[in-house]
Amino acid sequence: QDKIDTVSARPDALVLCYPVITWGKYEHTGSRLNLIGEEQGEDYRLTNLAEQVSDDTPPTFLWTTANDNAVPAQNSLLFAKALCDHGIWCELHLYPDGRHGLGLAHESERVSEWSRLCGEFLFELGY
């Protein structure tokens, strides 16, 4: 047996920034086509992450903006709801304004607080 097979690939926590994690009504179509193509088979189901949340999903920090014109905020909202439905510890920040791809958001004092809040979230988890 390979040693790598004895180590879990499950992350201890997730940090998702304006994530592309939902297919269907709120998808970013270009991302879906690039990742899995046109077919809506097993890959479609397995990569529609809000539907893959289980009791084993790691604690998750999410942030997004309400007016992201590339990835709808519903990607984060649906994932956060699924986490709550499973009793998974999560923290969600939905900022009213900000373009997609803000990164550390130095251009927006309000949104830039996400990195500090994320640090606090991870600290509370023991990291």
For each predicted feature, which ranges?
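Primarily recognizes the serine-hydrolase "nucleophile elbow" in alpha/beta-hydrolase
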Residues: 1-31, 40, 44-45, 49
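Loop/turn elements at helix/coil->beta-strand transitions in domains of secreted/extracellular proteins
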Residues: 10-13, 57-59, 86-91
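Acidic catalytic loop of the alpha/beta-hydrolase fold
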Residues: 22-23, 67-71
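Conserved serine/cysteine hydrolase catalytic core
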Residues: 49-57
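Short beta-strand/loop motif that positions the catalytic acidic residue
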Residues: 56, 61-64, 68
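C-terminal catalytic histidine-bearing segment of alpha/beta-hydrolase fold enzymes
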Residues: 63, 73-127
